[in-house]
Amino acid sequence: MTVNEIDLPPIFCPLESARHPRAHLVDERAREWIRTSPMCTTDEERTWVAASCSTDFFARFAPDAATDDRLLWTSLWVYWGFAFDDHRCDNGPFSNRPAAFSALAGRVQRALEAPSARDESDGFIPALQEIAAQFRSFGTPLQVRRFAAAHRAWLSGVTWQIGNAAAGRMPGLDEYVAMRLLSAGGEPPFAMLELATGLEVPAQDLERPAVRALTEMAIMVAALDNDRHSLRKELARGQTDQNVYSVLMQETGLPLQEAVAAATRLRDRVLLRFMAVHDRVRPGAGLELSTYLQGLRYGIRGNAEWGLRVPRYLSLGRVPDPMDEAPLEWAESPADDDRSAPRGLPTVAWWWDDALLGV
């Protein structure tokens, strides 16, 4: 099936849309930082990094960011993350060498956590350290540690993914879902919600099973949406190694179009469960937790809006196109309104545990 033949259904997402009112001004500062950042070595790289429109992305996650500086530096991590993903994870010299990537990931993570660490071997490392220094300047120690843990989780998932690719191994759907919760990079942006708003969620709230389930479900919905967003570009480039569609095709024998339909049904069932658990948890939440839960909602919707327009996914040429500002079409109802846990996915079946609703 060719790129033009695949039919991607509209996204079901009846959640609130919002964007920080000063996102455009903040992005001007972000792009100036990119122009001088050591993570980019050519003008073409800088152009494609800017084409991720990462301030627009995170301004939709945190439309209530407390200050422009908080939005700037959290958005700059998103710019950094997409660039690192493109040049060190999905492509480049580490993309099929798990041992080499694991060593790089260890150095990157230590540089994030230790302000005294020095490593000039890769331009991404000093760029990340500059961002981390700003996080420490305005975040609480706990917020910074939570972000570091989320960052480590992401790198572990990417290592898992690269290991599969190097071995020519296609995971089953249950394993893929477990891996994608990490490798999709959803943990760091949601951990940055606290850094952006300045509100620290008490540990007894953030670590509650229902809240952890909501965080994981938000990550999974966004991850499956990103598989959708990137499908046409991956088909055009022949890079369909590990996404939800290739996994379903391998496991079930479905053709691509039917795999798209099956993945859409799974995604919508997760979103419906997210909404049900959210509506039980939110009424009793204090300010900090309520703000975080709203951030999860903003993040799901914002990721969908951004992904449907961003040149990172839509541009197939060597030069990115402008941001697509055309009106978006949304599905009016879910592709599957079954409220039970999907079969064959024990790794996430606990999201449907009735105990989560006993808040």
From Swiss-Prot:
Binds 3 Mg(2+) ions per subunit. It catalyses: (2E,6E,10E)-geranylgeranyl diphosphate = (-)-spiroviolene + diphosphate. Keywords: Lyase, Magnesium, Metal-binding. A motif (DDXXXD motif) lies at residues 85-90. Its cofactor is Mg(2+). Mg(2+) 3 binds at residues 226, 230, 234. Mg(2+) 2 binds at residue 90. Mg(2+) 1 binds at residues 85, 90. InterPro entries: Isoprenoid_synthase_dom_sf, Terpene_cyclase-like_2. GO terms for molecular function: metal ion binding; terpene synthase activity. Substrate binds at residues 180, 233, 312-313. A motif (NXXXSXXXE motif) lies at residues 226-234. Its EC number is 4.2.3.158. Belongs to the terpene synthase family. Catalyzes the formation of (3R,6R,10S,11R,14R)-spiroviolene from geranylgeranyl diphosphate (GGPP) via a 1,11-cyclization and a 10Re,14Si-cyclization. The Asp-Asp-Xaa-Xaa-Xaa-Asp (DDXXXD) and Asn-Xaa-Xaa-Xaa-Ser-Xaa-Xaa-Xaa-Glu (NSE) motifs are important for the catalytic activity, presumably through binding to Mg(2+). This is Spiroviolene synthase.
